[in-house]
């Protein structure tokens, strides 16, 4: 990433473009996976499509990296750690995630009522989704009538719950904290794997303990990046080029792991055992490109803009595509078997264009109508609170 210059631009240790790059890649991969499931058109290499669901793991990695980066930077610079105020942290996270999520949930509820009507099961399903606990109950997780992709918000919510305690501990004693997180995932994995093939396994392999090691990799990546991202070496061209080359090598490693994941006979079993190698490769991409050559300004702005859309895109893409295909029956089709199942390649191509266009347009609309206004409200609230404390 970037262009060769005699004096490379400084490493952006506050917000590396590599984080935006990986976020766009992860969200795009998840979107490509779900859209491919509906139209069967292979617009990407097939192994990237078949293994596209692992992009969720990279989003979890990025959450840990980005949230912990201010702590890592303070630790690397010998500055006081950020103030750990759980209430303020929870308020910011809620303002960031919940408005767009609840709008999406309202739409999915309307669809569920339209398709099946009200029921006691739907009420319990809705209650779990409103409280971000949907992944903890079978009927609101794999049996949900609402938006199926939002199970990840349970994982994020549990991480946010412990982050105010975890961040200062990890900044002061990184090795023990990171080791314990990895141990939790390893022990949980060894407990869950023997249940592969049972109905219980589908409920287990994506639960929060199965991501604790992923969170550790994200926080470790932040510590490494913050420690290496300053100093005289960052002003020399050769080492920065070397980091960019290492980032490309990490991408090749990532591609090989995706190929292995896509070809696994026991896909979900391998997904659990292959999770740490995949996030280690993604973490290497993040750190190496972050320390490498800085991309040109237009590229950075484009990546930042696309990354800003990733949350709304993630929330809406699958539910929207299924709605367009089966409820609106677009592109037009009749009968009981969708055209992709009949090998209609012209329909597949048209569907691919329509589904991507709809997902992107709705994501843009939701970002500007929901996410951005509430982000502005959050900033104003924070400024008022700080002004009140200063009096």
Where are these regions (language model features)?
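Alpha-helical transmembrane segments of multi-pass integral membrane proteins
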Residues: 53, 211, 215, 219, ...
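Membrane-interface helix-boundary motifs at transmembrane edges
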Residues: 117-118, 167-175, 225-238, 294-303
